[in-house]
């Protein structure tokens, strides 16, 4: 196990197209860190730079106590798991697991020990003599993980490994990956564009945007105190409602809110908005009169899509099945402790 340190890492193509813009990050020994962001944000490029599959333009990357800028991928003591399983179709599962170890001249007894240990942990013991075409997608992904595990590397690098799986299997596999990582205690870097995967798996999240880090923290820190409007809308589903400074008063900040001078953006999450019944006092954080446009029942709760008086959308959540009707006018509010205020530059200004 080893820590991974990135110090002002940059990557440019053609000398003037910079895709990684001075990223600095320290990943602790045994930590599970998820790089998350939209397509094109640089997360896979950054992972490939750690792996040595992409050169770096400037800065340093260290794995353990060793700077690996000029170290070949095979010598970095890392193991990668990709979106495509990359299994040899003519080999059995056992042979796929053993292949890399044989190339490294690992003793036969040690190979068998590692295969047995990985197969037991991944529950693929009964598949060892099968070939990849005889396995399901989830089983193939387990074999791909097993091939990484038998390496006993200093770090695991995962590049969107669950993208090819259906929704139910993705949920199962993300739990298995996290359980396995905890039992092995191996430093892990995981790339995904799926914020649900990121939130449920990470010890810490790294949100990337256009080649730079927007925010680093635990999932709950990023959810409760997003550092920018970008993080606020990317983390959480449905995303946070963001309202610009009102010109014609389609909504009102509550009495407990102090607003910055100049332009600002006001944020409130759907679950923090409540319907105010007749006779209820205004909320101390946020108030608005809205028209209901659509209701989504998603099991134990409903999401109500509404419109402010200026036509801007507002989404809020209610428990159970909503009894409200389309085109109904309702008054909504939120507590001051649940609102988020961002300055004109999009950065957080509220505590």
Curated annotation (Swiss-Prot):
> Does the entry feature the keyword Membrane, yes or no?
yes
| Signal peptide annotation | none
Name of this chain's protein: sn-glycerol-3-phosphate import ATP-binding protein UgpC
This chain's function reads: Part of the ABC transporter complex UgpBAEC involved in sn-glycerol-3-phosphate (G3P) import. Responsible for energy coupling to the transport system.
Residue span, ABC transporter domain: 4-235
The protein's predominant localisation is: membrane
Here the disulfide bonds are none
Q: What's in the GO CC field?
A: ATP-binding cassette (ABC) transporter complex, substrate-binding subunit-containing
Q: Where in the cell is it found?
A: Cell inner membrane
Top enzyme class, one word, equals translocase
Q: Where does ATP bind?
A: 37-44
Instruction: Kindly give the InterPro entries that the UniProt entry links to this protein.
Output: AAA+_ATPase, ABC_transporter-like_ATP-bd, ABC_transporter-like_CS, ABC_transpr_MalK-like, ABC_transpr_MalK/UgpC-like, Mo/tungstate-bd_C_term_dom, NA-bd_OB-fold, P-loop_NTPase
PANTHER family recorded: MALTODEXTRIN IMPORT ATP-BINDING PROTEIN MSMX, SN-GLYCEROL-3-PHOSPHATE IMPORT ATP-BINDING PROTEIN UGPC
Name the species this protein comes from. Brucella abortus (strain 2308)
Its Enzyme Commission number?
Answer: 7.6.2.10
Q: Give the way it sits in the membrane.
A: Peripheral membrane protein
Q: What interactions and quaternary structure are annotated? A: The complex is composed of two ATP-binding proteins (UgpC), two transmembrane proteins (UgpA and UgpE) and a solute-binding protein (UgpB).
Q: Which UniProt keywords apply?
A: ATP-binding, Cell inner membrane, Cell membrane, Membrane, Nucleotide-binding, Sugar transport, Translocase, Transport
Q: Which gene encodes it?
A: ugpC
The protein's annotated catalytic reaction(s) are: sn-glycerol 3-phosphate(out) + ATP + H2O = sn-glycerol 3-phosphate(in) + ADP + phosphate + H(+)
